[in-house]
Amino acid sequence: MSSPLDDKKNDLIASAGKSILGVVPFAGPLLAEIVDHLVPDQRVDRLTAYVKELESRLSSAEETIVRASLNKPEGLALAEDGYIAASRAVTRDRASYIASVVANGLSVEEMSESRQRYLLNLLSELNDEEVLWLRFFFNPVIDGDHEFRNKHEKIFEPARAYIGAPESEIEKASIQESYKEHLERLGLVESKIQFDRKTGVPEFDKFSGKPRTSYTDITHLGRMLLREIGMIEAEPANK
């Protein structure tokens, strides 16, 4: 007699079979292996939202393109990477981001699966708050993107570390600065150093000792990642 957990796994495999992995006959056994051996038991439920999201995104995909993608090693690797990443996702937003990257890689003919795997790995380097901050820097002006900023105002509320500031404020400022520095290290944003107008020398923060920045802007790679996870629309092609 099968256990409830085995039933969940079988249901998950069957559900996924209705989406992209059902296109290629040998993809079903591949998913079964991923679920049975690579995904811890307690994470099976996390894949449900991902499978539904992937199925939704691929429902209008052209089967011949998907079949061609999955017939390539990189395409199968992308599908596998997606399921493994989704098994670690703890929010629906994260599952949606992953599904968007994978679906684009498998269903868009001119899309490189290797590129999508790179972006998926890049996404795995960020926590959910860092993703929101990356989206924040897409439109960094004070009066820009009110709806998005209001929705996440607790995250974006600026913290200031100054001499005599409460410990909680210093900690929050440290986290925010760490997020920005991490995005910079990954090449997703770049900060413009603030210079003294009279001397032309960079200005330094008295508290941290680091150069002050006038503003932080998103890079092309940052825009690409946001576009592929579905947080911004694709830019219209030049006419």
Model-derived features with residue positions:
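Amphipathic, membrane-active segments
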Residues: 37-81
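Short leucine-rich amphipathic alpha-helices used at interfaces
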Residues: 5-7, 12-13, 50, 57, ...
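Non-transmembrane, amphipathic alpha-helical segments
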Residues: 5, 12, 16-19, 39, ...
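Alpha-helical membrane-embedding segments
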Residues: 71-85, 152-159
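Long, helix-rich, hydrophobic modules that act as membrane-proximal anchors or helical bundle/coiled-coil regulators
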Residues: 99-239
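Surface-exposed polar/charged interaction patches
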Residues: 57-60, 64, 68, 85, ...
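N-terminal leader segment of winged-helix/HTH proteins
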Residues: 77-107
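Membrane-inserting effector segments that mediate pore formation, membrane fusion
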Residues: 2-53
